[in-house]
Amino acid sequence: MIFTNAILVISALLPATVLSLQHTEDSLFPARCWPDPCAGITFQNDTYVCGDPRLGPVVLPQKFPLNNELRTYARFGALCPAEFLDKWATDVAPNGTYIYPPANGFALDTEEQPILGNATLPVGMKLDRFGSEYGTFLAPLGAPYIERSLPPSNLNTFDGMYPYNYHVYQVTKEFVVGLGPIAPWFEQPGMGTQFVTYTNVLGLIDDGYLRRLDESEYDEKVEYSNPYTPGPNQ
């Protein structure tokens, strides 16, 4: 309710701005979740949807390439926020944590075995991830967020140098990863490609296998992992 009331207060002061904010709020939740889409959620911080860090930031990126990667994102699928947490976290209460998929998030075959194999990433390949450099998951540059099966909290900013916790890298020495399709999870369809490394990303940087890229080094359409991702000027 506090989240909704904040929008209404701003509307009295900034009518033009609030139209955009109200549209943003409306589009966050399925219509059936109204009039109180945040029911059952403990408010903690107005940076986050319903005030809960697990539900991710209220404002999503507007700048290429992140706006394209999130263009098809429906944060909660057909669920209301409390239903989403009830399904995907250990508890709706703030102390609940997300439940992650088995088998490192790889899709499973008909015998419930993960579909993956080893692959060598070539020098020059560009990769990205939403998450800290202590993690071991990477994706082809520009993969849509819905294909990654990540929770909304992976979009939270912890370091101002990396808004939305987004990091881009280039392979500088060949290395081997586990490669395979991503299982559906967190109300997302998944089925993108993930690379699981055998040491964390920070270790790969320190050992010279990866280097961090600046924005100017990944701003061309041709660099992206799929042919349907528009470039920054489209």
Curated annotation (Swiss-Prot):
Q: Does the keyword Disulfide bond apply?
A: yes
Q: What is known of its domains?
A: The C-terminus also contains a calcium binding site (residues 215-224) that might be involved in NADase activity regulation. The calcium-binding site is not alweays present since it emerged in the order Eurotiales, which includes Aspergillus species.
List the gene name. nadA
Q: How does it assemble?
A: Homodimer.
In this chain, the stretch annotated as Thump covers 21-117
Task: Supply the source organism for this entry.
Answer: Aspergillus fumigatus (strain ATCC MYA-4609 / CBS 101355 / FGSC A1100 / Af293) (Neosartorya fumigata)
Q: What is this protein called?
A: Conidial surface nicotinamide adenine dinucleotide glycohydrolase nadA
Q: What happens when the gene is disrupted?
A: Impairs NADase cleavage in conidia.
| Any Pfam family matching the protein | TNT
Q: List the EC numbers from the record.
A: 3.2.2.5, 3.2.2.-
Question: What is known about regulation of its activity?
Answer: The catalytic activity is positively regulated by calcium via its binding to the calcium-binding site.
Positions bound to NAD(+): 130, 136, 148
The record's annotation in InterPro entries points to: Fungal_surface_NADase, TNT
